């Protein structure tokens, strides 16, 4: 992945230096375990641990000649170890090292992503409670539907990210597996009990059965889960892009004093972070398809998956780490306009209460079909002639013959529409930390925002 989208710690994990360091960790663990079993001289295991090292450039130089990265690695390490290097890689095949080390790399990458998910959870929780009672219009098919609160929208995102966290914990655990079962998985050169001890030494579980490689359904599940996370972030970003549209302007990305939106149009304040999130999410989703293609390998293994994984595993984890950090900052600094939300909600003159009026008329004794007809008739007139729906309803004799003015007014009561938001919040956040309503932004994170805006 290009440096532009790589955060330092995740980039370090996927560096060549760290990859080879993990390979060496597997080699050392294997040699020491074999030494404890009396299969390798203890002085050899000690020499490999104490002298085992490598130079990345030397490995690359050897690989250019031998055309095999693991042989290049073991050759470079052997040069450092000396005579005892004859016990290096004893009883192992290349993918015993590569797959087991890859599990270690993914374990470390997963820890960062899990931390990222928890941080996003916390920010979504805080902002959800901040806007728990901030009314706005809910939209279906892009059209005004019924009132919600902005906090309810944030609670939805919190719940989805929580599910992603649970899914990713399972996927990460499924990838925490090593194998040292040899070239075809039959354990011919290394007893399965020793294989388990080596994996345990590395903090990994042992694949119960494998071929030359750990089976790639695990990797497909892992990358698919990353793609789901990216898709959820895309969903959040897409919503913010809509809310920032000039015609809507209910929320927008924080825009710093020195920021520029366009080289040609000085007035522009574009949702560039949200657009970046949506764009990079497409890359992660496309990687999931490649991961699925890797499941069907020939017989006990071919190498068609290897080149793919050199791209999709680092890139997918790097991108999701980046996307989660970007989304967390986006939500944390999001500028919200409660007055604009209320104005947009009221812009249709009460049309968004048609569903409640329909129910109230049915409860008052009108047949549902008749109630639907009379409410829709007034709604379409309000829509087509740009008239206030509420006033039309008040003048409709068919409606007033079933409902008194106070009853009609109650159908247009915004608080009535939102009366169960507290119960929904209690259900969503029942297992999370208690929150006070309208929590302020964390100290030191406040930003100057436009007038009549809430961040």
Regions found by a protein language model. Give the residues of each.
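Short, well-ordered beta-strand elements within core beta-sheets of diverse protein domains
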Residues: 152, 220-228, 356-364
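A short, charged helix-loop
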Residues: 197-213
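Alpha-helical support elements that line or immediately flank enzyme active sites
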Residues: 31-32, 105-117, 226-235, 240, ...
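Glycine-rich anion/phosphate-binding loop at the beta-strand->alpha-helix junction
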Residues: 164, 212-305, 310
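Amphipathic alpha-helices that form helix-helix packing interfaces
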Residues: 30-33, 113, 117-120, 124-127, ...
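Glycine-rich cofactor/substrate-binding loops
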Residues: 1-22, 26, 62-66, 83, ...
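A helix-coil-helix interface module used to build multimeric assemblies
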Residues: 1-187, 191-197, 206, 259-262, ...
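Conserved hydrophobic residue
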Residues: 40, 45, 248-249, 367
